[in-house]
């Protein structure tokens, strides 16, 4: 598998996680919507599914790991940043085969693509603190 397939899976997953967070829809419905309505050419679909399902099922545990490293309440983190750090938190905690530098760099790129101007700095700082715990 090409690394770009995983990058595309992360990109799609962060959008699906964002949608799931805001809609509160069943994660299976969100997954189905994204698989059927988005362009999934070149996407590692199995990895996309794992990321979405993993974050949905473990988000409370991931949030608890992130909270001590925040400079604000978790509820005050923007939905986009929340989706990104939850995805990265999942990879850092539950996917030991993914090097931490890769998980952090991918999250930074997602923040640059989807977040506000300084989102990538927030994401980088938070995840760096998480891996140093």
Curated annotation (Swiss-Prot):
State the SUPFAM superfamilies in the record: NusB-like
What CDD domains would the database entry show? Answer: Terminator_NusB
Q: List, alphabetically, the Gene3D superfamilies matched.
A: NusB-like (1.10.940.10)
Keyword line: RNA-binding, Transcription, Transcription antitermination, Transcription regulation
What is one GO cellular-component annotation here? cytosol
Q: Which domain of life is it from?
A: Bacteria
Q: Does the keyword RNA-binding apply?
A: yes
Question: Matching Pfam families, A to Z?
Answer: NusB
Q: Name one GO molecular function term.
A: RNA binding
Any one Gene Ontology biological process term? transcription antitermination
Q: What does this protein do?
A: Involved in transcription antitermination. Required for transcription of ribosomal RNA (rRNA) genes. Binds specifically to the boxA antiterminator sequence of the ribosomal RNA (rrn) operons.
Family statement: Belongs to the NusB family.
Give the protein's recorded name. Transcription antitermination protein NusB
Please give the organism. Answer: Shewanella denitrificans (strain OS217 / ATCC BAA-1090 / DSM 15013)
Q: Which gene encodes it?
A: nusB
């Amino acid at each position: 598998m090409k690394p770009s397939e995983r990058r595309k899976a992360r990109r799609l997953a962060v959008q699906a996680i964002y949608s799931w967070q805001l809609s509160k829809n069943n994660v299976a419905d969100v997954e189905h919507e994204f698989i059927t309505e988005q362009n999934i050419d070149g996407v590692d679909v199995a990895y996309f599914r794992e990321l979405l399902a993993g974050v949905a099922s473990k988000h409370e545990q991931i949030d608890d790991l992130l909270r001590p490293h925040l400079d604000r309440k978790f509820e005050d983190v923007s939905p986009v940043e929340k989706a990104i750090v939850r995805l990265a938190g999942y990879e850092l905690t539950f996917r030991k085969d993914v090097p931490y530098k890769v998980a952090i760099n991918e999250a930074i790129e997602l923040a640059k693509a989807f977040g506000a101007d300084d989102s990538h700095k927030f994401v980088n700082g938070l995840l760096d603190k998480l891996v140093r715990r």
